[in-house]
């Protein structure tokens, strides 16, 4: 049971995608940028909604609350993604439209695997730079969610919770610093993830990943901030 939960935490699927050899420069008018919402969510299991059925993850639910008729959403995320693996996934996906809203929630697997803070900062900065340089994403409003504290879950009870909490806080400080440098909205949901560490109503059946109820708490905080970002 323990092994299967651990593997589920950081194992990732891989999909072969056709890579476009040439990408032409795109001229984007102000009118196009202000048109329909196109939302790109980047992340790991927290953006996937691991353990939940249907479209119960927080990006889909956020999109449902702000979308209009012609709006679209795309999620590039896999359970187990580290920041570097997310960068590789973005590089290997052929984006076919311009996005004007992008979310990032990444880093828990960097912490879980014991990656150094120096490497994580380097990779997170690289991720932000990719978004700023890509013709399909550079016009977007970007927001970043902090890393939840997986130590504050029933699964985390068998780990050193104090150590996990301290490491999560350190990684989140790095994320916040990069966001401040790049004028990106940073949304702290970590404290919400620590609401009740032993309560199973806040996690899925694996005792680790957020339940629909926990995502709802996140969205209560995220939604008004994102609506403000889009004004």
Where is each model-derived feature located?
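Alpha-helical cap/lid subdomain in secreted, periplasmic
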Residues: 88-231
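Serine-esterase "nucleophile elbow" of acetyl-processing enzymes
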Residues: 17-79, 89-96
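Sec-dependent N-terminal signal peptides
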Residues: 1-6
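Short, flexible loop segments at the rims of nucleotide/cofactor-binding pockets, characterized by
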Residues: 78-82, 163-164
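Membrane-interfacial segments
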Residues: 16-17, 230
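C-terminal motif of bacterial Sec signal peptides marking the signal peptidase cleavage site
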Residues: 9-12
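Residue-level detector of flexible, active-site-proximal loop/helix-junction positions
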Residues: 46, 80-82, 149, 193
